[in-house]
Amino acid sequence: MIIGRKEEQQILHSAVQSENSEFVAVYGRRRVGKTYLIRETFGYKFTFQHTGLAKGNTKEQLFSFAISLRDAGYDDCPIPKSWLEAFSLLSAYLKNSTDEKKIVFLDELPWMDTPRSNFISAFEHFWNGWASARKDIVLIICGSATSWIINKVINDHGGLHNRVTKQIALQPFTLKECEMFAKSKGLEMSRYQLAECYMVLGGIPYYWSLLEKGLSLAQNIDKIIFAKNGKLSNEFNQLYASLFKSPEQYIDIVTALGKKKAGMTREEIIAATDKYSNGALSKVLDELEYCGFIRKYNGFDKKSKQAIYQLIDNYTLFYFKFIQQNENNDEHFWSASIDSAMHRAWSGLAFERLCMAHTQQIKAALGIAGVLSNVYSWRKEADETSDGAQIDLLIDRNDQVINLCEMKYSLSEYAIDAEYEQKLRNK
């Protein structure tokens, strides 16, 4: 059963209903549910499907491709010696298929592009020279290495330039979708617990699938993150390595951003890392934004060139705050931290990030979903005449109204007293 993803399913269905061949690129961070979405949408039925081999060399990739062709029904398929031959074999198989629409699903496509394999040129030839000239091919590519798909396919300046006909940048679940997912698994969670779980795991479906019935939220987090063999105990390194060819530079940037709650300007990032030029930094920041690890925003009174980059990936932030600091390898770290000052300080900041990830839902709750608006944050450094202040969410509406939003994480409804009201008015 697919939770949410209605718009994404519609895109996939429309590709099949099209009168022309379609080239669909699906990308997004590791564990966000890309493969599951595609397989469930098509009922696990494809004319041809293949998954690249993690760390396989060219010979192994080609052998695996031939095995997939045999599994699809090409019984006497030979082992190709090159990718040109491999895609020629695929074309021959598809020509003989009786499927009205021939759905070709190539999963983990970036893994197939091994050094000196000439994969890209053969892939270009398959689409440009054959598939795009027909009306019955639906080519769906997918992969966690988002930077590869963006640079080598979507933003390619060579043979694949403007060839992708439909894109799906698969996003994490919203809080509502996580609630639906938890209910589908039979997990009994209050909305307070759902919010805290989201603050730790974000909206990554795979992470939520690891939660077990019968355990408290704290016990679940201990088991999957802090236990010696926890399923997510080493997720941080695997996450960035799966997405980026040279993950170290991306980790450098998110590490710097992780130290500044409100985010940093480009100049501040360059100063903090002391190793990146503007050009190199632009590429890394763009790819981190594509993958949903950071967001780029403008302060309410700032110009575009002073845009601020903020780390928003919940798991990464949780890693920096707690997992990386768990030097004693305490397997019950989270259970022992409940109601501690450290936990309370973290939860307030994490709840602010949760709200910032749901500005569309906040606008809907305020009844202004249909009003054109921009979302900003505002901060003022302390000086000799006044204290510093910060407003995390400003909704600047086209109807000449500005909504000022303060986020407070509380077990019960938060009551604004006279002192706090005056504090807000001073801002």
Model-derived segments and spans:
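A cross-kingdom feature that marks ATP-driven nucleic-acid transaction machinery
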Residues: 300, 307-427
